[in-house]
Amino acid sequence: TICMVRQFRYAMQQELWELPAGKLEKGEDPFEAAKRELEEECGLTADKYTSLGEFFPTVGYDTEVIYTWVATGLHETHMHLDDDEFLTPDRVPLEKAYEMVMSGEIKDGKTIAGILKLKALLAEGKL
């Protein structure tokens, strides 16, 4: 089961399913940001984080880097949303999330990449 969030995105004028994510604070380590975002958006902490690598979503016009992590050994805590954040967390079985990707219900690129990579690594026995 993975934690996902439903969030209205004004640019797209629709609510989208996404993995927890956020921007790095100035000088922030990507690993620390991953831990922070999981707690802020899903109200969870984890015993273990495994990097799934990084990717460049918009190489034609931006230097953005997306770092992906999988968190295991989860513990409930409290959400800490930013003042301008309005989202709803939900637990989704990985197989259901995969079906949502394949049916087009999940449209967010980083979420699609993360779910597909996680599913592949699990199938290969690498996680």
PLM segments and residue spans:
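Conserved Nudix-box catalytic region and its N-terminal flanking loop in Nudix hydrolases
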Residues: 1-36, 127
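Generic C-terminal helix-cap and adjacent flexible tail
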Residues: 120-127
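Unchanged
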Residues: 23-109
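Short glycine-/acidic-enriched loop or helix-start segments at secondary-structure transitions
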Residues: 14, 80, 118
